[in-house]
């Protein structure tokens, strides 16, 4: 994938427009989780050091187009970045038509781009106005790279130069390394509640990986496809035939989808529900499967330890409740200890990484949700595609 890289450009005195992903949770005017801001600072700091005139925008929440509301304002983000830089960072509210100055080595935050008319529909008129503000457009929001919007795609068409920021470059390099040039065996762990939401990912991965580990509610559909009773567990009966065909497809290429041999069950979904260990073929009609058992867990740990590359998206049990979190905890520990190149992404996965404190032991953690999945599906991301075009 050849794109122009920000780090290769001379930015002195240039007007630089950065599209970051600063969509962070805010409570009572304060940022409650700043991981995305931290991830975006490398690009911002690089541009400031080079003496550029730096403008950064992002979406936050789901504002109504054309309507400014306090809860969708980037002001808390501007406050957070001001604190990091030790200087007051201005927030510019009405910026689309310009009319504001930025000094060399100064950073301004441009208010939530999703408030702008034409942003989500990627209107040419809006995109051209964005492009008029800058000499260099920097796409750094991998989290929205799968959406063609005016600030992620349209502006890249019309800006004098369109390049990939430091974070976007890192994300693309890590994903490419994991999926296009993987060290083998390549293992993917896909958890989550429904097969239907991850079906295209599962279909795409069955063509690439050596072992496809399914977890969470998804695993129940595969357990049933393998002939087991899953009781009252979350299970998509209508997708059992598809689960069967994916298992067959993997077998034909001497690859496997390991099926749990023991499980941890409860009668209801509750924090104080006692955990009961059962063989996978002994689940009763009123049981609900909430985790994998120790034998299955050990099998997965062995797979991870022998892997060359591990891609992790989604927990294997209800890890929010500790009694149903043993499987996910053991997998997290194995991912932290394996010599494999490890790549993790998705909200629940990051929550598990934080809970089990292995953040600095994963080779690469993707900040993106949907874009991460679409990359796993083998889809072209529109925001990356336009950067590739502009690099020609």
From Swiss-Prot:
GO terms for cellular component: cytosol. InterPro entries: Phosphoglycerate_kinase (IPR001576), Phosphoglycerate_kinase_CS (IPR015911), Phosphoglycerate_kinase_N (IPR015824), Phosphoglycerate_kinase_sf (IPR036043). ATP binds at residues 198, 320, 346-349. Substrate binds at residues 21-23, 36, 59-62, 114, 147. Transmembrane segments: none annotated. GO terms for molecular function: ADP binding; ATP binding; phosphoglycerate kinase activity. It catalyses: (2R)-3-phosphoglycerate + ATP = (2R)-3-phospho-glyceroyl phosphate + ADP. Its EC number is 2.7.2.3. Pathway: Carbohydrate degradation; glycolysis; pyruvate from D-glyceraldehyde 3-phosphate: step 2/5. Its main location: cytoplasm. It is found in: Cytoplasm. Keywords: ATP-binding, Cytoplasm, Glycolysis, Kinase, Nucleotide-binding, Transferase. Gene3D superfamilies: Phosphoglycerate kinase, N-terminal domain. Signal peptide: none annotated. Belongs to the phosphoglycerate kinase family. HAMAP family: Phosphoglyc_kinase (MF_00145). Monomer. This is Phosphoglycerate kinase.
């Amino acid at each position: 994938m050849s794109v122009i890289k920000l780090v290769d450009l001379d930015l002195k005195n240039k007007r630089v427009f950065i599209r970051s992903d600063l969509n962070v949770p805010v409570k009572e005017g304060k940022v409650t989780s700043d991981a995305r801001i931290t991830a975006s600072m490398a690009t911002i700091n690089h541009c400031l050091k080079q003496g550029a005139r730096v403008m950064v925008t992002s979406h936050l929440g789901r504002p109504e187009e054309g309507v400014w509301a306090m809860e969708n304002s980037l002001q808390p983000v501007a406050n957070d970045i001001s604190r990091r830089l030790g200087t007051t960072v201005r927030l510019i509210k009405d910026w689309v038509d310009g009319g504001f100055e930025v000094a060399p080595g100064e950073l301004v935050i441009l208010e939530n781009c999703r408030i702008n008319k034409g942003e989500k529909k990627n209107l040419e008129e809006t995109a051209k106005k964005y492009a008029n503000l800058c000499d260099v457009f920097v796409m750094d929001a991998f989290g929205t790279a799968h959406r063609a919007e005016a600030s992620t795609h349209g502006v890249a068409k019309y800006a004098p130069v369109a390049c990939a920021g430091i974070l976007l470059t890192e994300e693309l390099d890590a994903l490419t390394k994991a999926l296009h040039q993987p060290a083998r065996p390549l293992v993917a762990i896909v958890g989550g509640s429904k097969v239907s939401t991850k079906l295209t990912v599962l279909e795409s991965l069955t063509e690439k990986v050596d072992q496809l580990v399914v977890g969470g509610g998804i695993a129940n559909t595969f357990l049933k496809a393998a002939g087991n009773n899953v009781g009252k567990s979350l299970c998509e009966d209508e997708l059992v035939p598809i689960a069967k065909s994916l298992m067959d497809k993997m077998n034909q290429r001497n690859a496997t989808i390991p099926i749990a041999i023991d499980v941890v069950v409860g009668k209801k979904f509750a924090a104080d529900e006692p955990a009961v260990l059962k063989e996978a073929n002994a689940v009763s009609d009123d049981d609900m499967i909430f985790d994998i058992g120790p034998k299955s867990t050990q099998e997965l740990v062995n797979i991870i330890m022998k892997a060359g590359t591990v891609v992790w998206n989604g927990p294997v049990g209800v890890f929010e409740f500790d009694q149903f979190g043993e499987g996910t905890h053991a997998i997290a520990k194995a991912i932290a200890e394996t010599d494999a190149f490890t790549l993790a992404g998705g909200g629940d996965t990051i929550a598990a990484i934080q809970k089990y404190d292995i953040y600095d032991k994963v080779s690469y953690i993707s900040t993106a949700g949907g874009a991460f999945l679409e990359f796993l599906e083998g889809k072209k991301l529109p925001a990356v595609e336009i950067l590739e075009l502009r690099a020609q």
